[in-house]
Amino acid sequence: ILPSGDLTNFGFAMRDKGLSQGWRGEKLDLVPLDQPEAAPVGTLERALYRPLGAQTSAVHLAGRIRNPRDEGDPVFLLGKRSSRKLVGPGLWDGLAAGMIQAGETPLEALARESQEEAGLTAFDPVKAEFLACDRISRPVRGGWMHEVSCAYAALLPEGFMPEPVDGEVDHFECVSAEEALNRIEENLMMKEAAMTLLLSIRKLL
C-alpha cells in the first residue's frame, strides 16, 4: 500500500505544474495496470488518472422504456451531455454513467450516478441487468484512457422521463432503436454509451 500522504503530495505537485485535468476533489482506487483485479494500492485524485494513464473503472446504464403496444419496438432514453463537460461535450450518452469512486462497488456507483444524473431516487440497481465488463485502452485528450467499463440495462415504466439533476446532462430524449443506431453511426454518442446500448439491443434480438 502506498502512503496516502505521498500520493496526495504527488497529486498536488502535478496540479501545480498544470499536469492534471482540473481538480475535482474526487478519489478513485489506484490499482496496478498489470494486475487489474488486485486490491487497490491507494487512492488518487480523479483528475490525475488520464495524464498518468492509470486505470479507472466506470459504470454505464442503458435505459429502456416499456412499450406495451409493441414490445418489438424498444424505446431508449438518451441524455445530452452538457456543453461544459470536459470530455465529450454535447454528445449523447446513456441514461447514467460515471466513475466508480474509491471504496465503491459497481452497483453502488450505478445507484449513485442514476440519482445524481437522472434523479432516479427509487432505482434499485440490483434489478438492473448486467451486460458485460470490458477493458478499454485508447488515447484521449490530455493522456491515455485505461478503463474497466461495466455495462448494465434497466427497463423503466411506460411514460417515464428522467430530469437532469447535477448539471452534467442538458436534457433527455426518448428515441427508437433505429434512431439510437443512427446517432452511433454518425459519431454523436459517447463510445462507452454506444457499446452499452448495442449490448442492450443485442439482448432483445
Tell where the protein language model's regions lie, with residue ranges.
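Anionic ligand-binding catalytic core segments
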Residues: 192
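N-terminal leader/linker segments that precede catalytic domains of diphosphate-processing enzymes
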Residues: 1-91, 98-116, 120-161, 177-186, ...
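Short aromatic/basic micro-patch
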Residues: 174
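Short glycine-enriched loop/turn motifs at secondary-structure junctions
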Residues: 164-168
